[in-house]
Amino acid sequence: MANVFEVLERDHQEVKRLMDELEERPRGGADEQERMRQRKNQVRQLIIEESKHEAVEEEYFWPAVRDLVPQGKELAEHAIKQEQQAKYVLNDLIDYEPGVARFEEMLGDFINDAREHIAYEEEQVWPELRLVISPERAMELGTKIQKAKRLAPTRPHPHTPPRPGLLKAAGPFVGAADRIRDLVAARTRH
C-alpha cells in the first residue's frame, strides 16, 4: 500500500517519462512513417495516463485539499483550472497527426503546461497537505486513488464539470466507454 503522495508521485513520474520521450523526437532507424506511428502511440499513452490521473485527482485528491488545507479551496481551484485547460488541448490533439505543425505546437504547449502543473502540485500543494493530513488518511486516500484509477476515464472529457460527486457516479461508466473506444480504435489501426 502507498500513501497519496507516493501514488501521485508515481503518476507524475510516468507522465514526465512519456513527455521526455516525446520531446526527444526519435531520429533514424525506422522510416518516417514508422516514427510518426510510434509518436502517435506515445501521445495516446500520454493521453490515457494523464486522463486517468486527472480524473482520480478531481474525484479524491482535490476534495481532500479543499477540506484539510487552510487555503485549500484556492489551491484546488487553481489546479483544476490548469487541468481543465489541459483536457481541451489533449482532446484537440487526438484529431491531429504527428509531424503536422499544429500537432507539434499543441503538444509542446501541453508539455510545458503539464510540467508547470506538476511543479505546482509538488512544490505548493503537497507541502501544505503534508502539514495537515494524518498518515492514516494519506494511506486511505492513496488506496482510494489506486482503486479508482483502474476504472477511470482514459480520454479527456473537457465538457464534464470537475465535480467529485459526478465523477464518482459517472467515472466508471465513462471509463468503460473510453476503454471500448480504445479497443475499437486499436483494431482499426491494425
Predicted regions and their residues:
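Small-residue-biased structural context
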Residues: 1-190
